[in-house]
């Protein structure tokens, strides 16, 4: 269900704005999107796992907040990230 350290490192390298950047909104949204995708696959076989579903909803909410912040502060970065991750917006 969780992402591997190698995959997380690859996501950070792909979306980082500078070397060693792990806290920017782009990196955080990319990691959350990966975790959301993994949990979505999990729910295809475990439909009654409501405990994990709550975690999924919290992750979606956190990602939405980060995207709203990014949209408000820098529309260009927001648009590029949405296109790169293939999110509907």
Swiss-Prot record:
Gene Ontology molecular function: rRNA binding; structural constituent of ribosome
Keywords per UniProt: Ribonucleoprotein, Ribosomal protein, RNA-binding, rRNA-binding
InterPro entries in UniProt: Ribosomal_uS15, Ribosomal_uS15_bac-type, uS15_NS1_RNA-bd_sf
Protein origin, superkingdom: Bacteria
UniProt xrefs under PANTHER family: RIBOSOMAL PROTEIN S15, BACTERIAL AND ORGANELLAR, SMALL RIBOSOMAL SUBUNIT PROTEIN US15M
Classification via NCBIfam families: S15_bact
Description of how the protein assembles with itself and partners: Part of the 30S ribosomal subunit. Forms a bridge to the 50S subunit in the 70S ribosome, contacting the 23S rRNA.
Annotated protein name in UniProt: Small ribosomal subunit protein uS15
């Amino acid at each position: 269900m969780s992402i591997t350290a190698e995959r997380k490192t690859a996501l950070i390298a792909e979306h980082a704005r500078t070397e060693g950047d792990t806290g920017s909104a782009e990196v955080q949204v990319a990691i959350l999107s990966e975790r959301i995708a993994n949990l979505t696959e999990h729910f295809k076989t475990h439909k009654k796992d409501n405990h994990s579903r709550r975690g999924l909803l919290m992750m979606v909410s956190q990602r939405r907040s980060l995207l709203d912040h990014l949209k408000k502060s820098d529309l260009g970065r927001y648009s590029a990230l949405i296109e790169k991750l293939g999110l509907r917006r």
